[in-house]
């Protein structure tokens, strides 16, 4: 039987989540689900999670963004079947004003997100940039470190 791993402390889950900077955002519209690979910036000090969406007319993201009351953002690191970590943040997305982006949100995003240069490079004239904060209601994590368990860098910091 496969090992489903062990739950990790809230502090470890938060540190792992902050270290990743990318994951899959799950949105829903009635019974239709939509997963979006996305970069995010999470600030450990403030607990703020910022995302930048690059939308175009052919994208379904806007429809799902508007319809989703609750979303999940999943990030993970997989080394082998018995060596992995994951974290799931659940909450709601709040659209950010241009003032919020200029004053603090862009700094969080560009300091902590992974692969942000891709989003900036692919910006075209027919795209629209929207910024959101994921207001996290719960953040949980699991890990499996194999048979030869050693402390993770997140445990060592505790």
Where do the language-model regions lie?
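Short Pro/Gly-enriched beta-strand edge/turn motifs at strand-loop
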Residues: 7, 19-24, 114-116
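Helix-adjacent hinge/juxtasegments
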Residues: 53, 57-87
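Charged, gly/pro-rich active-site loop segments
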Residues: 2, 82-158
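Short beta-strand segments
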Residues: 20-57, 73-74
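A generic structural signal for nonpolar/aromatic side chains embedded in well-ordered alpha-helices
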Residues: 17, 64-65, 108-109
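Amphipathic alpha-helical interface surfaces
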Residues: 13, 58-61, 101-106
């Amino acid at each position: 039987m496969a090992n489903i791993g062990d739950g990790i402390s809230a502090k470890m889950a938060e540190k792992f989540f902050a270290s990743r900077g990318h994951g899959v955002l799950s949105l829903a519209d009635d019974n239709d689900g939509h997963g979006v690979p996305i970069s995010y910036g999470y600030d450990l000090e403030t607990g703020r999670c910022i995302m930048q969406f690059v939308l175009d007319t052919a994208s379904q993201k806007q429809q799902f963004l508007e319809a989703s009351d609750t979303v999940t953002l999943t990030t993970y690191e997989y080394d082998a079947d018995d060596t992995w970590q994951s974290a799931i943040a659940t909450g709601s997305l709040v659209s950010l004003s241009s003032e919020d982006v200029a004053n603090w949100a862009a700094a969080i995003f560009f300091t902590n997100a992974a692969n942000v240069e891709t989003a900036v490079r692919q910006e075209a004239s027919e795209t629209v940039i929207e910024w959101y904060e994921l207001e996290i209601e719960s953040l949980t994590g699991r890990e499996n470190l194999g048979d030869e368990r050693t402390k993770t860098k997140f445990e060592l910091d505790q």
